[in-house]
Amino acid sequence: MAQSRDGGNPFAEPSELDNPFQDPAVIQHRPSRQYATLDVYNPFETREPPPAYEPPAPAPLPPPSAPSLQPSRKLSPTEPKNYGSYSTQASAAAATAELLKKQEELNRKAEELDRRERELQHAALGGTATRQNNWPPLPSFCPVQPCFFQDISMEIPQEFQKTVSTMYYLWMCSTLALLLNFLACLASFCVETNNGAGFGLSILWVLLFTPCSFVCWYRPMYKAFRSDSSFNFFVFFFIFFVQDVLFVLQAIGIPGWGFSGWISALVVPKGNTAVSVLMLLVALLFTGIAVLGIVMLKRIHSLYRRTGASFQKAQQEFAAGVFSNPAVRTAAANAAAGAAENAFRAP
């Protein structure tokens, strides 16, 4: 067919219509030399180098944020850390609160177990067991050793521990008031020399009332609550009533008695403000001690009536204590033996 179209010349150039590679549909899908790729690049086809690779332009960096001027807050040991979620923080706070609550409960149980252990040890020791004295708390190098054993948390029942502790603090306050009374009387004596008798009596009251009040009314009260002793209750009521009367007299402050009460503070000569203020403070302290003493006497009496104690029980305890005393029994035996010997020698 080609020969018929070209006039039968076999050397004629083929026309574009007879070349299948010149078809417009094929030419459209041929790759362009301007954008040659590695797959279709022919180094022998042209002497021009391939186009240079152009990397994509980098994205612009965000501007740096300004540093915060607010100082970082230090978290407390119990505060949960911020993990970026409100629900997480709430759950962490709840867990921490629950742990603290459990820890407090465990501490209370541990204290209760310690108290019960001390009570069991006290019951195992018994009343006749020997224990090392610990009061007054003197240093080891002191030649005078402690005279009493005192442990309110171990020896006193739990429902009476607060009352016994209050009475112990009352005794300490009365001792402090006597020391301040001595200083006030000394200041008054320095201002007015005719107050020598009151100053001398203030020294006597410090030396006399401090040990006697502890032995005569505090120790009987302590032993009464420790062993539910009716006899010690009666001893305490009698002596502490007298002590309350003395507290009232100390607060009144009769001149010349050695007490810096209200009357003694008000009769200080004018111009001695410091001495007057010191004596008024002592009078106020004496008044507070007197009021607290009366209140505690009434309170302990109400506790005594609820314990089932009575005067007959006190008599029985006194008789049992007297007859169980070895010295009393020895004296009674010697007296009986002497009486019998005299009876046999009589004509």
Swiss-Prot record:
<comment type="similarity">
    <text>Belongs to the SCAMP family.</text>
</comment>
<dbReference type="Pfam" id="PF04144">
    <property type="entry name" value="SCAMP"/>
</dbReference>
<feature type="modified residue" description="Phosphotyrosine">
    <location>
        <position position="53"/>
    </location>
</feature>
<feature type="topological domain" description="Cytoplasmic">
    <location>
        <begin position="298"/>
        <end position="347"/>
    </location>
</feature>
<keyword id="KW-0472">Membrane</keyword>
<feature type="modified residue" description="Phosphotyrosine">
    <location>
        <position position="41"/>
    </location>
</feature>
<keyword id="KW-0813">Transport</keyword>
<feature type="transmembrane region" description="Helical">
    <location>
        <begin position="171"/>
        <end position="191"/>
    </location>
</feature>
<feature type="topological domain" description="Cytoplasmic">
    <location>
        <begin position="1"/>
        <end position="170"/>
    </location>
</feature>
<feature type="transmembrane region" description="Helical">
    <location>
        <begin position="277"/>
        <end position="297"/>
    </location>
</feature>
<comment type="function">
    <text>Functions in post-Golgi recycling pathways. Acts as a recycling carrier to the cell surface.</text>
</comment>
<dbReference type="GO" id="GO:0006892">
    <property type="term" value="P:post-Golgi vesicle-mediated transport"/>
</dbReference>
<dbReference type="InterPro" id="IPR007273">
    <property type="entry name" value="SCAMP"/>
</dbReference>
<feature type="modified residue" description="Phosphoserine">
    <location>
        <position position="76"/>
    </location>
</feature>
<keyword id="KW-0812">Transmembrane</keyword>
<dbReference type="GO" id="GO:0070062">
    <property type="term" value="C:extracellular exosome"/>
</dbReference>
<feature type="transmembrane region" description="Helical">
    <location>
        <begin position="247"/>
        <end position="267"/>
    </location>
</feature>
<feature type="modified residue" description="Phosphotyrosine">
    <location>
        <position position="83"/>
    </location>
</feature>
<feature type="compositionally biased region" description="Pro residues">
    <location>
        <begin position="49"/>
        <end position="66"/>
    </location>
</feature>
<feature type="modified residue" description="Phosphoserine">
    <location>
        <position position="32"/>
    </location>
</feature>
<keyword id="KW-0653">Protein transport</keyword>
<comment type="subunit">
    <text>Interacts with NEDD4, NEDD4L and TSG101. Interacts with RNF126.</text>
</comment>
<keyword id="KW-1133">Transmembrane helix</keyword>
<dbReference type="GO" id="GO:0043231">
    <property type="term" value="C:intracellular membrane-bounded organelle"/>
</dbReference>
<feature type="cross-link" description="Glycyl lysine isopeptide (Lys-Gly) (interchain with G-Cter in SUMO1)">
    <location>
        <position position="313"/>
    </location>
</feature>
<feature type="transmembrane region" description="Helical">
    <location>
        <begin position="197"/>
        <end position="217"/>
    </location>
</feature>
<feature type="modified residue" description="Phosphoserine">
    <location>
        <position position="72"/>
    </location>
</feature>
<keyword id="KW-0597">Phosphoprotein</keyword>
<feature type="modified residue" description="Phosphoserine">
    <location>
        <position position="85"/>
    </location>
</feature>
<dbReference type="GO" id="GO:0015031">
    <property type="term" value="P:protein transport"/>
</dbReference>
<feature type="modified residue" description="Phosphothreonine">
    <location>
        <position position="37"/>
    </location>
</feature>
<dbReference type="GO" id="GO:0032588">
    <property type="term" value="C:trans-Golgi network membrane"/>
</dbReference>
<dbReference type="GO" id="GO:0031625">
    <property type="term" value="F:ubiquitin protein ligase binding"/>
</dbReference>
<feature type="region of interest" description="Disordered">
    <location>
        <begin position="1"/>
        <end position="88"/>
    </location>
</feature>
<keyword id="KW-0832">Ubl conjugation</keyword>
<dbReference type="GO" id="GO:0055038">
    <property type="term" value="C:recycling endosome membrane"/>
</dbReference>
<keyword id="KW-1017">Isopeptide bond</keyword>
<protein>
    <recommendedName>
        <fullName>Secretory carrier-associated membrane protein 3</fullName>
    </recommendedName>
</protein>
